[in-house]
Amino acid sequence: MTKRYFSLLAVCSAIATSTFADDTPTNSLSLGKTYLRCYPQADSNQWDCAEYSSETNLPIGRSQIQQAPNAYDFVSAENLTPAAQSALLPGCTGMYIDPLGDQTNAPSPENTPLIVEADDSVLTGSQKAQLDGNVQISQGARSIRADSMTYSRETEEASLAGGVTIRNPGLLIRGDKASMSTTRNQASFENAIFVLHGQHIRGQADAIRQTSDSSIVLEGGSITSCEPGSNAWSLGGAEIKIDNEKGQGTGKHITLKVGKVPIMYVPYIAFPLGDQRQSGLLFPSISSSDNGGLDAAVPFYWNMAPNYDATITPRIISGRGAMLEVEGRHLNKSFYTESNIAYLPNDDGGQDKDLDTLVSNGDITESQAHPYTGQNRWLGHLSQQGGSASNGGWYSTIDFTKVSDQDYFRDLGASSFSEQNQSYLDQRAELGYLFEHWTVSAMAQNRQVLLYDLDTPYRRAPQLNAIGHYSVNGFEFKLDNELVRFDHPSNEWRNGDTLITGSRLSTDYRAAWPIRGRWGFIKPEVGYKALGYQLESDGLASSAESSPTLGAAQASIDMSVIFEHRGGSIMQTIEPRVYYLHRAYTDHSDLYAVTADGQNVNFDTSIRTFSYSQLFRDSRFGGRDRLDDANQTTVGLTSRWYSNNSGRELFSASIGQVFHNADRRVGLNGEELNTGQTSELAADVSVMLGPLSRFYVNSIYDTEAAEITRASSGVYYHSQDLSTLANLSYSYVRDYRQSSIAAGTTEATDIDQVDLSFVTPINKQWSLMGRYNYDFTQAQELETFLGFEYNDCCYRVRLLARKWLDSNIASLTDNHDLEHDQGVFFEVHFKGLGGSGAKVNSILEDSIRGYQERERRNKQ
């Protein structure tokens, strides 16, 4: 309590000095039932009090101080207002409600009168005042209640007895007895309980000391976020300090109990209150897998300043050793920076029974089974966003991630950093400036490959861009210039031959005249693309051109008309679209087979995946090493159905095809091209099955072979509160190929997979979750897990049993029984004491569509 709150106690002295003169008899004098309203004098140390003859004369504000509905101000869900019910967190059966309500806009207590009420008041001279029977003192939103109260003017101390209750906004304290001192600015309560309404935290103690409006100290007490009647977990000890204003708690000689069972002791602890992040321990994540054994991580959050913090996570992996992970964040007016480092010294090599079986059978060697034994393994990551690109001026971007080896994430994962399902780790830095019409930038980029069967991309060291945009009298002009220096982390290709390196200048200049309206759009465009190279002579064939140049003019027109039909509650549109593209052929022979081993000049280019959206692109290649010739017309048709009431799209269907007016001649690697007169048929369908569910189909159909070459379909559903999620998808690709930088493609294979994932509540506290991902081509499971979540206001527990394909073992054996890892992942989060680990969250967010949004909703 602060000095302004202890002015409540001074009213007892005010009663004596304002009611009687100095010659008041020294013997006791009873005044009977007392109603007083007091205002501070100018010096704020003396009071003017006026007595009211009856309770009806009390000010309106007095009636707002109501007796609490129960000891903890806990209101069950059925008795909450509709607004409070909608804010009730999952698993909670009610919430702590401050009877004073929201005091955000209430007047300051210093500007409100002090109200005193008692059944009887007794004065002993001018030094002692006693209030007896239903003592109630209030000033604004602050109040004191007790059966009796005695104040000594000489010692400036007060004592209260019998059902003592003190309220501040968001804080309730009750005790059998209390003593207060205006000189020490302190109040203490015996055999007391307290509630922090907003943080959903309560506690009890042998004694509670209140040193400010928002700070209390528990002696011989405990705290919990569990609802009244439950002590599933509690944090208790010799001394616990709660600072509600800072959102932080500290404790000495603390024991964490689950029920009545102590599970952890620490001599000192700092912890956050609620889910806001303050310095202190976060709760651990524990998992076990075939590969690493038992894995336990205990994060510590360090709030160093309002604009920078760190999370330090010691981890112990039984099969590999002890490691440390550190995440740091920094924010100022110009930059946001995030960094991660992790280090595992002297890897023990892991423990994998499947690999040991292969070693015992003589299928692989010990070094193949445990290639990192004795090695130091590490991760480094830096991400930075700087400047203000949206408002013009300078901007910068850094996205750099590097690991010690390709198997780092497979073996170790990361408790505070996620790079799940990544083929590459980007290592990129960019600096740019936005002018009114131009954007200029310089960028350097490298990528670390995480998969063994992928080629390592070229490095860009550096890349310079200058892109201009102008609009003049309805015409739009784009001037795109790019200069890149390409080299390679390895000077030699896998076969030992020298890789092609060099520089490339590319330009793409365009002029368009777009016309748009409710009826549709039309966009004629002309342009010219050019390429120029300066190739390093090392490795080039004697007949190869070291400075090849290419150029091609192009023209296109894209147009669509929208026809609408309204009938009843539905509006239907028919949207035909026609796109014509012509680009002149330019000879690419100077880019093919320029080395003795037949390498082609191809730094960053691949064939785009064909889809409905690809129908209306101006190139079939991704990248800038090819100027593909084109003389083609694309015809597409889209129909949409909208609800006239809600405006939602209920149904959409699109179908389209490219008609080639001439054979294509430019290929990726100089190969003979398909000279068919039409492309495959592309179609997309999306159907809203209900307000919260949608079905989709995307397919590519080869009209010549009369077969589907690529298809994906699925249905997904989520409940209004996101407690239920359900996803089912199917994907098929015939003859899937991966492009190679040097010479063509890898071996073709089919992809034929189904993926089912879900989260469904069993009741208010229990939820079931799972995933089943199966590959029909290989006749094996890619990932399967089943788990449950228990979630109430007190704590959350998640347990997953997971089985997933180990790509490393799969490359060493044909035995499907040995190709999978299995693991159990466990996390517990004691609510009110900060966040939990990230491993289970990472698995669920990567595997179940909508889970990340579900988590975000649950924290609101």
Swiss-Prot record:
Signal peptide stretch: 1-21
GO cellular component: cell outer membrane; transporter complex
Assembly and binders: Component of the lipopolysaccharide transport and assembly complex. Interacts with LptE and LptA.
Keyword Transferase attributed: no
Compartments in which it is found: Cell outer membrane
Statement: the UniProt record of this protein carries the keyword Signal: yes
InterPro entries assigned to the protein according to its UniProt record, in alphabetical order: LipoPS_assembly_LptD, LptD, LptD_C, OstA-like_N
Biological function: Together with LptE, is involved in the assembly of lipopolysaccharide (LPS) at the surface of the outer membrane.
TM region(s), chain numbering: none
Origin superkingdom: Bacteria
Key words, A-Z: Cell outer membrane, Membrane, Signal
Name used for this protein in its record: LPS-assembly protein LptD
GO BP: Gram-negative-bacterium-type cell outer membrane assembly; lipopolysaccharide transport
Gene it is expressed from: lptD
Taxonomic lineage of the native organism: Bacteria, Pseudomonadati, Pseudomonadota, Gammaproteobacteria, Cellvibrionales
Family: Belongs to the LptD family.
Pfam families documented for this protein: LptD, LptD_N
